[in-house]
């Protein structure tokens, strides 16, 4: 083509432009130049949606995601998104979380009822996925919720606590524009309407956000971030006593009182009863504080211990999240970070959260094995110099905040395991907490339960949690028991406590010294 003709169809350059300014006025120039200008005008003529998109960009607003555009178009056309048909039965109206809570046998029976084929060999997650696709193809949109995990690429997925926050086929995709618009972070509990995956998609997609952390989505933007909240000393006591025959919680309430926002270590040798102690404390919190949210986080644990914990502690206000010893270290790290981030979002909303972590020693081992935390500098026992930074950050998240809400973490630390690394990990955490419950090997050998060393266990600033008269009587009791060995002290204490129905009655029998 001749250079002069090429110049005629070359679009003008602008540093700041509007699509409308690119339209050329009609010209009476005859010949090829006129045809070229007409062609150029056709090329630059915007379609009917271009002006709208430019106005959005000029206003510096995030563009709508594809799912949100679908909702917008349906609403503009006079339809309503996510409304089931009138003849839809209540059973068909189950949301994604209702299906995730069903047992495998119940899912199979439901799939057979709805006519699904070749389902006998499907794993549980795939069965839920097939059921959801079948229902959504018949009834349209459904409702879903989960805990958000934001990936490095900017998008995220809603994970389910039923699957211990593992990646599953029925996870719900959340677009980057939705994350930016509502200021979402990892750990946010998001609920809304979802749509099924298209032909070239693998996951369900979130269409419209209806709730964030069980509140209005716009309320999230008015909340202060967790790191900007003001930490305080624990002042509100957690009473775990709930059964007169459950002596472990009664002993803890007297000698190591726990407050909302406590950061405590349960120092335990092998087979000292730390798991049973955590179960008793968790049951006490759930029984006495129905508004508190309890999470039992089991890291590098045996599968049978996980099953036992799930059956012993059952409550709508409790989660048992685990990553067993056959999982890779990266999985331990991911589940721990998800649990702590979710707890932070709940604290921002004013909720009291209590996490029982078993164990922080194994979590530190996982970070030590993670290549992202490695610095190449080894300490005693083979511990990397940078491996403790993130576990300390997780443990240090526990606090009572002035704006309302609290995060309490009670973590077990393993000692006397024969591993030098475990001893170094315990020394790193020693002094970072404000509560220690020390379990004694001699008490375990004598079969004395609870195996708590009363002289080495205690709470910092316990006078802020106890009544003045109660504190005086406990101090007198401590002095009396300190004159004996740990075995004799606990044996005598158990004998006296079994004669009373509760701690208040027991303390009345203690005469304080002036």
Swiss-Prot record:
Swiss-Prot/TrEMBL keywords: ATP-binding, Helicase, Hydrolase, Nucleotide-binding, RNA-binding, Transcription, Transcription regulation, Transcription termination
Gene Ontology BP terms: DNA-templated transcription termination
Binding residue positions for ATP: 259-264, 271-276, 302
GO molecular function, one term: ATP hydrolysis activity
Region (Disordered): 25-52
EC numbers: 3.6.4.-
Record's keyword annotation contains Zinc: no
InterPro entries (UniProt xref): AAA+_ATPase, ATPase_F1/V1/A1_a/bsu_nucl-bd, CSD, NA-bd_OB-fold, P-loop_NTPase, Rho-like_N, Rho_factor_ATP-bd, Rho_N_sf
A Pfam short name: Rho_RNA_bind
PROSITE patterns reported in the protein's UniProt record: RHO_RNA_BD
Domain Rho RNA-BD: 141-216
Compositionally biased intervals (Basic residues): 35-45
Functional note: Facilitates transcription termination by a mechanism that involves Rho binding to the nascent RNA, activation of Rho's RNA-dependent ATPase activity, and release of the mRNA from the DNA template.
Subunit structure and binding partners: Homohexamer. The homohexamer assembles into an open ring structure.
Family affiliation: Belongs to the Rho family.
Name of the protein in its database record: Transcription termination factor Rho
Species whose genome carries this gene: Rhodopirellula baltica (strain DSM 10527 / NCIMB 13988 / SH1)
Annotated gene: rho
């Amino acid at each position: 083509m001749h250079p002069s003709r090429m110049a005629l169809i070359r679009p003008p350059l602008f540093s700041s432009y509007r699509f409308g300014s690119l339209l050329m006025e009609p010209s009476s120039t005859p010949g090829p130049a006129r045809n070229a200008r007409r062609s150029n005008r056709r090329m630059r003529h915007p379609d009917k949606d271009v002006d709208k998109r430019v106005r959005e960009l000029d206003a510096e607003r995030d563009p709508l995601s594809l799912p949100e555009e679908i909702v917008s178009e349906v609403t503009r056309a006079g339809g309503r998104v996510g409304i089931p048909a009138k003849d839809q039965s209540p059973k068909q109206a189950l949301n994604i979380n209702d299906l995730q809570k069903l047992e495998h046998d119940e899912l199979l029976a439901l799939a057979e009822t709805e006519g699904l084929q070749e389902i006998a060999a499907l794993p549980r997650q795939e069965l839920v996925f097939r059921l959801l696709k079948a229902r959504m193809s018949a009834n349209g949109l459904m409702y879903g919720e989960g805990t958000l995990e934001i990936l490095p690429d900017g998008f995220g997925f809603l994970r389910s606590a039923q699957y211990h926050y593992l990646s599953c086929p029925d996870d719900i995709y959340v677009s980057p524009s939705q994350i930016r618009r509502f200021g979402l972070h990892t750990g946010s509990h998001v609920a809304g309407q979802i749509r099924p995956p298209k032909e070239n998609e693998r996951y369900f997609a979130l269409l419209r956000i209806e709730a964030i952390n069980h509140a209005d989505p716009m309320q999230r933007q008015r909340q202060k971030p967790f790191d900007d909240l003001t930490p305080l000393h624990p002042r509100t006591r957690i009473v775990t006593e709930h059964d007169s025959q459950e002596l472990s919680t009664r002993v803890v309430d007297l000698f190591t009182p726990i407050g909302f926002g406590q950061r405590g270590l349960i120092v335990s040798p092998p087979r000292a009863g730390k798991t049973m102690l955590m179960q008793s404390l968790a049951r006490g919190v759930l029984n006495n504080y129905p508004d508190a949210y309890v999470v039992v986080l089991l890291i590098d644990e045996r599968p049978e211990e996980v099953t036992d914990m799930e059956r012993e502690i059952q409550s709508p206000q409790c989660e048992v999240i685990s990553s067993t010893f056959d999982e890779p270290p990266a999985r331990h790290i991911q589940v721990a970070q998800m649990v702590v981030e979710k707890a932070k979002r709940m604290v921002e909303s004013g909720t009291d959260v209590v996490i029982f972590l078993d164990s922080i020693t194994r979590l530190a081992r996982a970070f030590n094995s993670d290549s992202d935390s490695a610095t190449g500098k080894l300490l005693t026992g083979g511990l990397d110099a940078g491996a403790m930074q993130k576990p300390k950050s997780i443990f240090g998240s526990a606090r009572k905040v002035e704006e309302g809400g609290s995060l309490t973490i009670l973590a077990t630390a393993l000692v006397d395991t024969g591993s030098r690394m475990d001893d170094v990990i315990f020394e790193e955490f020693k002094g970072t907490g404000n509560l220690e419950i020390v379990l004694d090997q001699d008490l375990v050998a004598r079969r004395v339960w609870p195996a708590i060393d009363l002289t080495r266990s205690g709470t910092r600033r316990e006078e802020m949690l106890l009544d003045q008269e109660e504190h005086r009587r406990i101090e007198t009791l401590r002095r009396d028991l300190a004159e004996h060995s740990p075995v004799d002290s606990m044996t005598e204490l158990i004998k006296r406590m079994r004669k009373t129905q509760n701690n208040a009655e027991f303390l009345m029998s203690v005469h304080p010294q002036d």
